[in-house]
From Swiss-Prot:
Lineage, broadest ranks: Eukaryota, Amoebozoa, Evosea, Eumycetozoa, Dictyostelia
Transmembrane portions of the chain: 1181-1201
Sorted UniProt keywords: Glycoprotein, Membrane, Signal, Transmembrane, Transmembrane helix
The protein's name: Protein dduB
Cellular component terms (Gene Ontology): membrane
Signal peptide: 1-22
Residues in the Extracellular compartment per record: 23-1180
Main location: membrane
Compartment annotation: Membrane
Domain of life: Eukaryota
Gene that this sequence comes from: dduB
Keyword Transmembrane helix tagged: yes
Membrane topology, from the record: Single-pass type I membrane protein
Glycosylation sites: 68, 122, 150, 185, 283, 348, 360, 437, 448, 518, 535, 554, 585, 631, 759, 815, 830, 844, 946, 1042, 1058, 1098, 1108
Amino acid sequence: MKFIKYLLILFLILKINYFVESGVDCQKNTEYFVENSCGKNPSKLNINTDIYYFESIGITPYSPPVYNESTTNYFWYLKDGIEYTFSYRYKGCQNIKSHSIVSQGMYYQLLSQPLCPNTYFNYTIYNSGEFGGNTNYYSTPQNIISSNYNGSCTINILITPLSNSKGAFQSSAAKYTYPTCGFNNGTISVDLTKGYSNCHLFSQFDTSFLYEIEPSSPCFYSGLESNYYYLFVDSKECATERLSIQLFNVFTPLEITFENVPDYNQNSIVSLSLSSGDNGILNKTNSFATVGGTGPDPLSTWSHKETKITSTTQFGYFYNKDFSTDPLKVICSFNDGFEPQKFNPNFNFTVTKSDTCLENVTITFYPLPSQTFVVHDYILGNILPLTNNVLSVQYNKFLHISEISSNSERYYSTAFYAPIYRVVETSNGIGCWKTYNITIGEYQIYSNLTMKVYDGDEYEYIFYPIEGVFVNVPANYFYIHYKVKDCEVESIIMIDKYEEITPMDDVKMDISIYELGNCTHETSILVNIDTVFGNFSKVYSSFSNGYFSFYLPNCSCNIGFYYSIPPLIDSETFSYGFISDLDCNSTGTVIQLLGSNGNTIQEVYSNGIKLIVNNDVDTDFAYNIGPGENNVTIKYSNTKGTCYKSQMINIQSPYEVPLVEVTPVIDCDSSDGKISISNYMNFYSLDIIIDSSTIPINSGLVSNLPTGTYTIVYGNSGSCANSIDVYVPSSEQYVEITTSVISHPTCGEQSLNGDGKVNVTLKVLGIKKNTFYIQNQNQISSLTFSDGGVYIAAAPGLNTLSISYGGCIWNRDVNTTISKPTFSFEKIYNDTCLSSVYYKLINNNTNIAINSITSPYTLYSYQNEYYTQMATNLIYPYTVTWNTYCTETFYQEFTFDTPFNYYSNYIQYEIVKADNCNSFKIDIIIKNMNTFQKVTLSSKYPTPINSTHAIFKNLPPSISYDISFTLFDGCSGTEMVGYQQLSNGNTKETIDIIKVNDICNSGKGSIQLSNMDTSNHYYYVKTFSDYYVYTSYPIQPTTNDNGTIISLLSNLPVGSYNITRNCKSITNCYIETKVVIENKDPIIESISVTDSYDKLNNGTAEIKLNYNSTYPINFKIIGTQLSNQNGIFSNLPPKTYEVQVTLTDRMCPITISQSFTINFKTSPTPPPLPQDPSDELSTSSFIQLNILSLLLISIFTIFIL
């Protein structure tokens, strides 16, 4: 019992001593204050006491504490409008102190989240008045910016609806029509059958909603003028909606007829007229037409105005709102524009050629008055001179013809007698492993016939034909070079058989060192590749690792590979020389490294210690070395930094230095560290620098030193002084230091500050110390923390903590691991019309307190919550700062998708082409007008046809039209219409074309044009050229025997041809027809037979082909010995035969066969012979002879019997 009593007394004494020593008053409230926010940032709860004096401290609802580097105290972020409980317990105390905290920052509250995009809702801004009052507001969902009474605080909040697909607009219940200027006939209506009621309409300028506009009938408003309106309407699914409606003035469509538009820089004749809309109120007496500008400049007549049409030309009309002719009245003015940038002006020239290459090609241009033609040699780039619009140019030129005023162009080739060719794939390979035979027709007439290809390294390879056939050439661009007839200049045509993909299944590769390099010479790599084309090898040179490309010769195959260069070896040898005074005993011996050989010294080490360049010496590569033996390692590289090596040399420094012995600090309070120098007698002078003061060292001993690094200055004469640094450590014998990781860092690198927390406990001579200093020696900008024994900026990895108490310093290594936080923006709302998608930053890391977020793009913040809105696909960068010391930039890809798609085909339409170019007009009929609030084309509104159809009439010529529209839900877009329909022309006319395909790749295809109107039109043929551009040339018409104008394009090889007819008087009035000349194999066109008479075997057969080859054709009847080269067979007995026809033509080496039958034909009965005496005698004698023979045969038979 006494023992327990003594223990209890001892416990009370120790407890009393603890509280006396710590000085903690368990009943005292800690000092704190609330820093109220100003809208954007959250409020803060600040404390004036170090957090580590508490056993526990925090707020509920939970928020992590944040370190304030400027005050060295902690704070907590508070969300305004929330009541927090602030609780804490001092160390050594049992009682928990609690306080209720409510910040008074400016914030907002919703009664409920709005239901639909236009729901009219109420929200309250708190603490926005001069004395903390609150203000109620009404709005529709949007990003709301609101300021307090004096504008010193601004709040930025994002209100999103629960649904973006519901509402009066979204369901097409709310509709409106635009008023015609001056008529006040606009309407706004709501379909009450769709669940809507209680409509109220106000002008948007009536901000207090005092003057309601009365409806004509429930929820139908008529007689409205151009204005901005608010329509309020109730429904169950959206509560009260406030619809914002803007009614624009529309105009009676202006119809423009272009009677003559030869070129948009020349005068053209146009006629203008109004449609029959608006009940015929507008007419030519109370409205005035204008051409050529935007201002009122009335014409004397509405038609036949000559003007130059340019990109700024305006056609329009105006009238007074009261339809009077008083010029001082307020007017309605409409203008429509013309878009010549979409047109090509007429471009006419003719070409005259001869059959000899010795004469030039003549090209004659026929420009309009404003046109100027310039011709360039496409290959050489130089301008070719024109004389009176006539160009005389050699054959074998590729011309670029441009027209200056319109910035339009054509290409034309004068290649002479381009060969006909046939391409046949000869392999089953894929990708670039394909091979081809290219057969040149009539190759005998060409000289210097070669084919050139270029590999990826731009080396030229030449193939030569075998009897006009380039055999098994690999996939690539083939350039056929040739001379023909009397041409001295080489012509070139190109055949595109390039294949980009290189399959690697059958490729074997061997890479080896061909020649090992060094720091001045690259290493050479020998690459051997075994492919379907054979074995290839190539040498590459490089200093460093890299990705290489092996382009196989001749073909388009490209084999990539990566190779690592082995460490390069250099034979560099370094020497050194002493620079410092040899008579001055010193550790500051300076050496100069010699023999750099153009290499760059990276680092120099002596006995494992990195040497610093001596900048006080006027020479390169000078370093200080220590006394005695120095094993110096030199690390160097070549000038490109691709070759690294190290070399070691031994340098002996002859100088003597102080021999030092150090006694560590044991008593931290008295700092009893010592430095003793045993050879102090050998120096002329010997001093120590303490706190910037130089103190002589007497008898070689310095005492009462705290832990630290000291500089010993010594010299052997009065003119020479040098120094060494000596570190006095603290004794580890009487200290206990324990470290533990409170929390691992969430950011940082080893040399930078992190946010990890490390607890340090220090006992000296068995006594726990509560106040000491901690630094991290591994960090560049080291922080010092003196309270609580906690280091709060630990970085990932090794943290060498320097713990200072009194005159002692100890180092402890603490390893931490990083636990990086993750942040992400999550989509919270898609608005209806693709204008924005809203995202909110999600922070799921409970140990993270965000200090701030920045981004180069839109970013909203409210109460430490962050939002952004996007209207496109992009990689979104944002920089987050958290837990005071952490900053990192994150990237998130935003993929933009919303219900509305600008590029969908919303408009259903029909293009009505012009009848012809003499009465040119194009109409566009909109077939689903009931799905749009508004449809316009160049500010023009269509003329209604009925409830679903409307028409844009008499449109100017174009290759397409951009129609703008607004849907009932408010979404707007622009759609290009007509491109496909007008790509083959913009009139209803056609060109009569008769096509004859090529046979046997002979280049004998043809295109015949008839019903040609050369008085009003130009005709062109356009085909793909050898230089990836279209070659155009005019078609020359002829007149046939019937007086009809026709044109026959003959001797056409296989290919695509665009036949274009351009109008002479109307710009861009054209017809274009694509004609494809295909290759067809010859066929047996006919077999003519003559049947055979009985037993005479006199049948005949004649076989004819639809192709006359210049090469022999072999005809053979299978199963017989009959064969020839003309296809005519005779003396054929009746039966069925099969003829086989073999063509030896190189352009189509084929065999075809067909059966035919020689039928049996009975001989006809001979006619009666004439009855003259000689005939009778002969007949009688013949009969008598027969009777006698018969009698003899009978007698002989009887005799035998």
